[in-house]
């Protein structure tokens, strides 16, 4: 006889076991950088470096004063060749005459040679012992230049005393009288105040006296 109709589907069977893991896919693109982390702790201090070379030795203030006096004398010889000068020494002795030359020639001169009105050499005086040089019957010449403070600057008690004198006598101070070696070596007003030297003048910048601030002893103002 004829085939009968297909019967209904049976119920689904149980899920089979998971198959084996497939191979890894290709690596994806790199993600964005994360935010910076916090700063780590400061490392330990490294060892000290080697000691540097010794710096230049400061000149003694007395030598620096002599250098300034020598510098000024070189200019006074050129600027006042026919004027009489009174040179006051730190001992209280005085010499006078025209300013002739510095001896020996060169940058290390230690003597000032005085000459008479005919240019004949008279006595020579030690630059190291000069308290002041006063040019009589002449006016201060603004062309005179001065050495700056040495580098490194002098130190010590002598340097303190020299600096104190300059501080005590600023430019414009009037009625000044400076004593050295038991005598007044300058009086008037302060027109220049430089390392190692003050310049004292009379009315209208007359009779300039170039005073070593290493030699000044008693100061009135």
Predicted segments, located by residue:
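Collagen/collagen-like triple-helix sequence repeat recognition
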Residues: 1-64
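Conserved RNA-binding domains used in RNP assembly and mRNA/RNA metabolism
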Residues: 56-221
